[in-house]
Amino acid sequence: GHVGADTAAVVLSTGLGQTAELEAGDQPTPSPPDREWVRLVVDVGTNAEIVLAGRGRVLAASSPTGPAFEGAQISAGQRATPGAIERVRIDPTTGEPRFRIIGVEPWSDEDGFTKAAIGTGVTGICGSGIIEVVAELWLANLMDTNGVIGGADTRPSTRIEPDGRTFSYVLFDPTELGLDGERLLVTQNDIRAIQLAKAALYAGIRLLMDHLGIDTIDEIGLAGAFGSHIDTIHATVLGLVPDCDPDRVTSVGNAAGAGATIALLSGSARQSIIEVVDRIEKIETALEPAFQDHFVDAMAIPHRTAEYPCLSTRITLPERSTASAVGSERSGRRRRRNGAAR
């Protein structure tokens, strides 16, 4: 597996080892109040490293998310460099997008964007951008819970156009903003790549929750270069992580690097992490039969069965369709939609 020195450094810098050692009375009050505080930290990368602490235990696992979160396997994907779309909002009434690119302060619908973007251009979509656009497509009802763009229960939009046997969403058309460059589409294959990645991550988390015997998490930290830049609300909408109080889903930055620095500067910290590492229970996701079941359920957006009551206090979520089961439209075949504007 990929649980090693990086994970140990994350545990050190985030204090997960201390969380597991605290008595219930020394921790913030969870809900319900008769149980101990549970913390989750995820270092998001090609292999996500997951650490869950609570009930006097620390559990860790690695989940194979692949490179989609870093812009790879995405048709217009790229690294997080100037010109890359990093933030996206889609109007739920019109279906029209607005976005922000790295290196340019105004959003695409604000004065000054075109002038500022001439130097960089709009070159692609980075990891944080693809997370937001997929979540926004679902929130705007342009994509169904199975991840199908232009699904039978979604609403029509001129931004959705035929693309072979499926549909794609037009995120950027340079002619609309007076810029050079090519159109940027979000394709059905892009959606599927993100679904596979996020399902692997969620399944790994859920597996650790099963081993700890819990159904809720009180605090979530997103670590790593990618985890530091994604919007936590959109990450939860997509279903990267289980439901949690939105105020307690935060970025913890380069936790592995911070932990390495602490270990270099403190002998007592090095001794502490040695002791904690001996107590960490490593779970091999590949050997767990339940992993596949969790993975399949997590392919839906945000999830096939899990509820998100905490998230619902912050953002209005679409009603979950019961018309079709997850996987019923996995073939990706293009379907005609009545009244769809093309």
Label the model's feature ranges.
Residues 7-10, 14, 193-216:
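Phosphate/ATP-binding catalytic cores across multiple sugar-kinase/actin-like superfamilies
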Residues 109-111, 164-166, 170-185, 223-240:
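Short, surface-exposed loop/turn segments at secondary-structure boundaries that line and modulate
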Residues 2-7, 23-25, 262-342:
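Acidic, glycine/GT-rich loop-and beta-edge segments that sit at the periphery of enzyme/chaperone cores
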Residues 31-39, 96-99, 112, 198, ...:
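Non-transmembrane, aqueous-exposed alpha-helical and coiled segments at domain scale
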Residues 9-12, 20-23, 34-129, 231-253:
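Glycine-rich phosphate-binding loop of actin/hexokinase-like ATP-binding domains
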Residues 54-59, 73, 206, 210-277:
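Catalytic phosphate/nucleotide-handling subdomain of diverse soluble enzymes
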Residues 44-46, 150-160, 216-227, 276-288:
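A glycine-rich phosphate-binding loop feature that marks nucleotide/adenosyl-phosphate handling sites
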Residues 131-196:
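Gly/charged contiguous loops adjacent to phosphate- or pyrophosphate-bearing nucleotide/cofactor binding elements
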